[in-house]
Amino acid sequence: MAGNFWQSSHYLQWILDKQDLLKERQKDLKFLSEEEYWKLQIFFTNVIQALGEHLKLRQQVIATATVYFKRFYARYSLKSIDPVLMAPTCVFLASKVEEFGVVSNTRLISAATSVLKTRFSYAFPKEFPYRMNHILECEFYLLELMDCCLIVYHPYRPLLQYVQDMGQEDMLLPLAWRIVNDTYRTDLCLLYPPFMIALACLHVACVVQQKDARQWFAELSVDMEKILEIIRVILKLYEQWKNFDERKEMATILSKMPKPKPPPNSEGEQGPNGSQNSSYSQS
């Protein structure tokens, strides 16, 4: 593990340029509007969150899984691997990397099947179509894409330090923590260092709680312009989220999403060859 964030693969390889990110996304934006793509981000983050909660994983494991998911689709089109397969794959890998312990094959498939059926049936009327061999193959592609750069830094630790330094832990921490969780529904984890995201979330929490922290922020040696950029993204998320009726909209958005070849049918799932490449696309 890197001794600190500035020497880590997270900083050196996975803080991306916004223009490069948008350029990579153009293939998908031929099929989806920017707003629809944003809603897909929110939706699949919700799927990963629900999977993690079902498996009783720590929030940091869920956050790491979400970052893996975003990293993959920052480099590849949604068409390359079905996000419905990628989501549990990211949870599976993150649980190992964050030393939570390996989630057993049976539990993982059971959780994915149950969560899609009970929480997201309005978007996925059919059964979860994948089995463990698909997840293991998908994990291989995910590891290859990330070049085995698996350590992810999160805003939670710096947030805790900042709130303690400010001396307002009880008032600010619960709200700022929830805002950090919400930032994973955006691109922020791909674009900014975690400590900046933590400061932006703390700033929003201070405004909401009417805590005057101008002096505390003024004494920081940090680029406040970047903090304000992050705050604008957070506020845009809440504005868009407020008007997002997931149950009504997601089926249509998912139908427009570029897809790999159709997932295996029930007869082909157990066969050694019938479903080998059905969740992947080379184009």
UniProtKB/Swiss-Prot annotation:
GO BP of this protein: positive regulation of transcription by RNA polymerase II
The UniProt record lists the keyword NAD: no
Function, as annotated: Component of the Mediator complex, a coactivator involved in regulated gene transcription of nearly all RNA polymerase II-dependent genes. Mediator functions as a bridge to convey information from gene-specific regulatory proteins to the basal RNA polymerase II transcription machinery. Mediator is recruited to promoters by direct interactions with regulatory proteins and serves as a scaffold for the assembly of a functional preinitiation complex with RNA polymerase II and the general transcription factors.
Keyword field: Activator, Cyclin, Nucleus, Repressor, Transcription, Transcription regulation
Gene3D superfamilies: Cyclin-like
Keyword DNA damage: no
Entry's family note: Belongs to the cyclin family. Cyclin C subfamily.
PANTHER family: CYCLIN
UniProt subcellular location: Nucleus
Known partners and oligomeric status: Component of the Mediator complex. The cylin/CDK pair formed by CCNC/CDK8 also associates with the large subunit of RNA polymerase II.
Ranges where the Cyclin N-terminal domain occurs: 46-144
Disulfide cross-links: none
Protein's recorded name: Cyclin-C
Pfam families the UniProt entry points to: Cyclin_C_2 (PF16899), Cyclin_N (PF00134)
Any one Gene Ontology cellular component term annotated for this protein: nucleus
CDD domains, alphabetized: CYCLIN_CCNC_rpt1, CYCLIN_CCNC_rpt2
Cross-referenced SUPFAM superfamilies: Cyclin-like
Signal sequence range: none
Biased composition range(s): Polar residues: 272-283
GO function term, MF aspect, one: cyclin-dependent protein serine/threonine kinase regulator activity
Region Disordered: start-end pairs: 252-283
